[in-house]
Amino acid sequence: MTKESKPDRLRQMGALNPKPESVRAPWFREAGFFDPLDLVQVKYEMLRHAREDGTNKADAAALFGLSRQTYYQAEAAFERDGMSGLLPRTRGPKSAHKLTGEVMRLVEEHLDANGQLQARSLADLVHSRLGISVHPRSIERAVARKKKR
């Protein structure tokens, strides 16, 4: 069995820095403990550099190859959750989890009868008949995916 490399593990976690070459902090350039590929470590060091070394936030963000917005997001996450706030989080569902087979059958029946896609009225129909609140845009995307197949 082959051992996974650190970049592979970071990629799986969502913590691989997409622009490690942008990290200009000298202690990241020297081989050793600091790894510009590790986005969690880069964010932590950026915050530490601004707080402990007195660098302003914009300069700290630039030194670590990140935006000011990323600095403020990391700062808020760190204040709220500590070190675990810097870890990547999985975002919402990646699929249309509300568009079950039952919902899609109702949508398709309505489309077959009317032949015209009116997503808002379909969303209202799904809500009134099945009690499921679906965004009209989700219905439009599902119908478009179905047409592609």
Curated annotation (Swiss-Prot):
InterPro entries per UniProt: Homeodomain-like_sf, InsJ-like_HTH
Composition-biased stretches (Basic and acidic residues): 1-11
Alphabetic keyword roster: Plasmid
Stretches the record annotates as Disordered: 1-20
Protein name as catalogued: Uncharacterized protein y4oM
